[in-house]
Amino acid sequence: MSWRADILTLFPNMFPGPLGFSLAGRALERGIWSCEAHDLRQHGLGRHRAVDDTPFGGGAGMVMRADVLDTALSALPALDGRPVVYPTPRGRRISHEDAERLSSGPGVVVLCGRFEGVDERVLEKHDIEQLCMGDVVLSGGEIPALTLLDACVRLLPGVMGSDVSGQDESFADGLLEYPQYTKPAVWDGRDVPDILLSGNHGAIARWRHEQSIAVTKARRPDLWDAYLARQQVH
């Protein structure tokens, strides 16, 4: 059975979007995963298929209605253990471990919010997992949903050409990835580091690890602290 993604959205034509190309697109064609977008307007209320209303307590914007979202979720095929994820700036920041966890299961359902967000009650009723792509606010949940799905799909067996590709990437061992180089060996007066041309695989591995440490320390001190903490545990 393939890994299944169902997306609840006001803009179903955004899917699979970029996921129809490259690694994810080829995996989609091969049946490694499947993707179906469901139009929330189909469950909207009244002549205008309304999916939102004004917030209780006042305030700007509109809030997506719990009853509409509940109906949409209930209309989905059996979840079969698939978690429902809601991308939101209020959520816990997503990690590589989240992508590994989600990709190891039967699939995922993604609820894409719009406006000022969704009624809290539907999140509580369906025990929806709230994840954040970063400390930034976007216009809706569709782009974060694409990001989440891409992060998961590329980890599915048979998607990447080499299992080593995934093992060496940023976050796979808790560190950011080392710098990469390709031909030509000299470009614009800049040389590829000699160690990478040496053929000494042990020395190259050590250099790459040192570079990963340096990059992580400089750019993501939070990741570096977490990495050190894990090393102390083990």
Curated annotation (Swiss-Prot):
Listed InterPro entries: Alpha/beta_knot_MTases, tRNA_m1G_MeTrfase_C_sf, tRNA_m1G_MeTrfase_TrmD, tRNA_m1G_MTases_N, tRNA_MeTrfase_TRMD/TRM10
The keyword Methyltransferase is assigned to this record: yes
Compartmental location: Cytoplasm
Domain of life the protein comes from: Bacteria
Molecular function (Gene Ontology), one example: tRNA (guanine(37)-N1)-methyltransferase activity
A Pfam match: tRNA_m1G_MT
Keywords: Cytoplasm, Methyltransferase, S-adenosyl-L-methionine, Transferase, tRNA processing
Catalytic reaction equation(s): guanosine(37) in tRNA + S-adenosyl-L-methionine = N(1)-methylguanosine(37) in tRNA + S-adenosyl-L-homocysteine + H(+)
GO biological process, one term: tRNA N1-guanine methylation
Disulfide bridge map: none
Protein residues bound to S-adenosyl-L-methionine: 113
Keyword Methyltransferase: yes
EC number: 2.1.1.228
Quaternary organization: Homodimer.
Task performed by this protein: Specifically methylates guanosine-37 in various tRNAs.
Protein family per UniProt: Belongs to the RNA methyltransferase TrmD family.
NCBIfam families: PRK00026.1 (NF000648), trmD (TIGR00088)
Name of the featured protein: tRNA (guanine-N(1)-)-methyltransferase
Species annotation: Gluconobacter oxydans (strain 621H) (Gluconobacter suboxydans)
Gene for this chain: trmD
